[in-house]
């Protein structure tokens, strides 16, 4: 069904790789499962990539690290698409729609790329680097589709 769409296929492989590495064996996590199922059911939508990004943000939260992006909502100006914030000593440039938790009506590859880059950086800084884990290449490949 998705094998003729490299971006969607790459997203599925990426999610499976992240879950395989980050989730403990034999431990059920209903919220992550429900979030994954919701993404799978929505992968045919035009804005599927934003649902993928929100899946990753939710995964970060469910694994014990909430980015608390809504606390930055007062720092957003009307003319800015991105905001630089500091989380646990790391500076991130994040798209405003992630702070508002609202999928943008108009989107570009730049917006998608910066969104994916933000979630990758948080995942790496919180889970992969401290635990000396290899980040999945499939996730980087997905990001490269939006260059």
Model regions and ranges:
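Non-catalytic alpha-helical scaffolds and adjoining flexible linkers that form interface surfaces
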Residues: 1-147
